């Protein structure tokens, strides 16, 4: 087995053309957006944007990346994120070039775009994406201020004791702050927040944004979920400030965060105009 691995690595080094493996949806989107999609030789089963990335050979998911399949794709570079330390160590041990990034904040998303732009010699395109993000952020200030905003991840059609919300250590926090408002949820714990209805009532958010990419275009079903949340005795339901964002990009920290910021701007304008 070891002999086979070293033969594969030797073959990789003989290749002149860049052969890229992307290990997360956000990295995959950025690489494609920079115009390097034709060089992506493998990605994960969660990398489904842009459309052509669905046809790229798959090497597993978040928790089951196949090291053997990565090697079989003969990459010149593997680009991933910092949440699979063991895989990253194994790749380094085998002499595979790896680029590892964080994309949890707006700053880290922009840095990732710029760094990959430099790596692929696509600096101008990368700067354009970063400028678009900055311009979108600048546009959301002072529309409404001092509101408590709660962003809910993949809400169900009934309220439960396991409601996933965005905490204070993700890019959503940066977006809310840039708008002059605050996250209704607060904790110094960086772990993924899971709350129940009692905690939401105690938070008493003024605005609720429900991320529903699984219901893209299914407006009746989205309204059903909104109606469930309207039953809660909170400001957001009393003031009819419960909204959905049904696009996949809302949960992917890539250059397309620009589009979520623009969606959030429309929500804030709707709140203001009531």
What are these regions (language model features)?
Residues 49, 83, 87-119:
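Flexible loop/hinge segments that line or gate small-molecule binding clefts
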Residues 44, 166-192, 212, 244:
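His/Asp/Glu-enriched short active-site or ligand-binding loop at hydrolase and phosphoryl-transfer sites
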Residues 59, 64-80, 96, 196-213:
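Proline-aspartate-enriched helix->loop->beta-strand connector
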Residues 18-19, 65, 110-118, 125-132, ...:
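Structured C-terminal subdomain patch of bacterial secreted/periplasmic proteins
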Residues 85-93, 207-226:
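A ligand-binding cleft/hinge motif common to bilobed small-molecule-binding domains
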Residues 3-15:
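Sec-dependent N-terminal signal peptides
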Residues 19-83, 181-184:
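A short, structured surface patch at a secondary-structure boundary
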Residues 18-34, 125-179:
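Basic- and aromatic-lined ligand-binding clefts that recognize polyanionic substrates
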């Amino acid at each position: 087995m070891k002999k086979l691995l070293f033969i594969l690595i030797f073959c990789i080094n003989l290749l002149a053309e860049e052969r890229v493996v992307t290990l997360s949806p956000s990295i995959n989107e950025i690489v494609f957006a920079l115009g390097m999609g034709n060089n992506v030789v493998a990605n994960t089963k969660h990398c489904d944007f842009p459309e052509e990335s669905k046809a790229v050979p798959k090497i597993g998911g978040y928790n089951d990346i196949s090291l053997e399949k990565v090697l079989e794709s003969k990459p010149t570079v593997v680009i991933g994120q910092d949440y699979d330390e063991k895989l990253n160590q194994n790749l380094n041990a085998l002499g595979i070039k790896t680029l590892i990034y964080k994309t949890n904040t707006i700053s880290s998303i922009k840095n990732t775009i710029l760094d990959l732009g430099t790596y692929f010699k696509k600096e101008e395109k990368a700067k354009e994406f970063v400028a678009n993000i900055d311009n979108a952020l600048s546009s959301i200030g002072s529309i409404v201020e001092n509101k408590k905003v709660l962003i809910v991840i993949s809400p169900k059609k009934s309220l439960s004791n396991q409601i996933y919300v965005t905490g204070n250590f993700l890019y959503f926090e940066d977006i809310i702050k840039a708008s002059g408002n605050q996250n209704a949820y607060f904790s110094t714990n960086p772990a993924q927040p899971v709350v129940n209805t009692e905690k939401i009532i105690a938070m008493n958010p003024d605005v609720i944004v429900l991320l529903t990419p699984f219901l893209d275009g299914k407006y009746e079903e989205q309204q059903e979920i909104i109606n469930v949340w309207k039953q809660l005795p909170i400001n957001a339901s009393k003031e009819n400030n419960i909204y959905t964002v049904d696009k996949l990009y809302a949960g992917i920290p890539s250059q397309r965060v620009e589009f979520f910021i623009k969606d959030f701007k429309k929500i804030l304008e709707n709140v203001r105009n009531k």
